[in-house]
Regions:
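Phosphate-coordinating loops and pocket residues in cytosolic domains that bind phosphorylated ligands
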Residues: 205
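A structural boundary/capping signal
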Residues: 1-193, 198-202
Length: 205
């Protein structure tokens, strides 16, 4: 009963989670040519969700240059969120991530992409969403995510509480269909769709 209750609580709101592996098939679908693992070494002065400023601050004090690219998270094994991210390129051409993140430590899966620079709005980095299956409810759900992210970029990161509430309300109407899709497309040995980090057969199956 305890495990079921915990899983039910997580499933009420699916969380994006870090995939343990990104297959070559998935990378092609995402349009990613190069994926590398970058050492995470948070700078003492760095703030979460502030990677570009963190990198620029680090470079001012220690040298190096900015390397832009993408990091990845998964929703219910049915969609991928690609978040633009900045890391430090050291003089020896190695990369380090200096931004703290409670969900990622050790090594960060990172796809270098200098074209991200053209997508930056007032130092705010964009996200992209890619559906892994063809379903209208999922397309509608992702469209809400895209709209919310565009508002974030256009408003320099400040989104009114009333706007957020409207986004959440619209998304909640689609949520039952999204949850059913996640259950349907998660195998027993896949990472559980709820984002717990456990295999499905030991979690929400």
């Amino acid at each position: 009963m305890r495990r079921y209750s915990a899983c039910l609580a997580r499933s009420i709101s699916l969380q994006y989670f870090d995939l343990p592996d990104l297959s070559s098939v998935l990378l092609r679908k995402l349009g990613v040519k190069d994926l590398i693992k970058v050492r995470v070494s948070p700078d003492v002065a760095a703030l979460p969700r502030n990677c570009l400023n963190n990198v620029n601050s680090y470079i001012e004090r220690h040298g190096g240059s900015v390397q832009l690219g993408w990091i990845f998270s998964c929703l219910g094994n049915i969609a991928i969120k690609m978040t633009a991210h900045a890391v430090v390129k050291l003089p020896d051409n190695s990369l380090i991530c200096v931004t703290p993140n409670e969900y990622r430590s050790g090594l960060l899966k990172f796809a270098p992409d200098s074209s991200v620079e053209d997508l930056i709005h007032d130092n705010f980095l964009p996200t992209k969403f890619v559906a892994l299956i063809d379903d209208q409810s999922l397309k509608d759900y992702i469209a809400i995510e895209v709209e919310q992210d565009q508002l974030r970029l256009n408003s320099k990161g400040v989104v009114a509480a009333s706007d957020l509430q409207q986004f959440h309300l619209r998304a909640s109407l689609l949520y039952p269909a999204i949850l059913n899709l996640a259950k349907k497309h998660t195998g027993r040995n896949d990472q559980c769709y709820c984002g717990s980090g456990k295999k499905n057969k030991k979690c929400c199956e």
